[in-house]
Amino acid sequence: MQSVTSVSGGKTSAYMAIHYPTDHYVFACVLTNHEGSISKDKALIQECQNRLPHFVASHEDDLTLRRILELEQELGKQIKWVASEFALEDFVQGVTDLPGYRSGKPRLFNSLTRFCTAQQKIIPIAAYCHNFIDGAKPVLMNLGFRYDEPHRVKNWNCKNDRHRMALSCPVTGGNWKYKETEWRISDFPLYRDRIINADVRAFWQKKKWDFPEVSNCRFCPFHTDFQLQLQAQQFPENLDWWMQLEAETGHTFGKRTIADRINQPLLDIFDSPCVCTD
């Protein structure tokens, strides 16, 4: 069985990649065509386009992308970049032509319909593992759940390791056919070895590597209000994407608008953070 590490660009997954070597490393990049999200670092854009030719911009922090590139050098092994054919806003606006995905009326992702994670992360990684690593056999995948995150391990079940794979395409006018398959077997080496956040931070402080204070996509609605407020100060240009989609669709990413969450006076730092890398 081939082993795979899914790296997110955050400090925990990078720690895991270094301390628990695997046969393959993969990074799923969340794409956007939003002009305000285009990096001002032209060299970074070129590096991203070398790996993803259709790359325009990402909802990831520039520092996240740089850390992925540097981690590849640290590992001495390729980190394969994967991404959806479509930008995230294409899924929101319902303009994709992917099989099995509804088109037409726009809708926003939320805690019940997290198609952002599914379409931009899980499906590209699963497709890569299925098509280029071990075919119909599942891969052993390291996931970066730490010992101080027991709820993430306890809430995990086998359904998270299954995916509907397309078996045939309707070239002759027929319908797409699918089969649900177990594409990965998840392993939690950090949890097993009782690695906690303090261990991870101490390691990177010693190496003098810095990471984004808030991991995963900028302004992810699954971040805490406190994290959103931090990002509003750092990335006002990217914030426009989220607020504009709420205005255009007449819906919100959660119970409150992004603007309400950012402008509220109370900073609650004890909410559960985003776990999009699940």
Predicted segments with their positions:
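Nucleotide-activated chemistry modules centered on ATP-dependent adenylation/adenylyltransferase
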Residues: 1-278
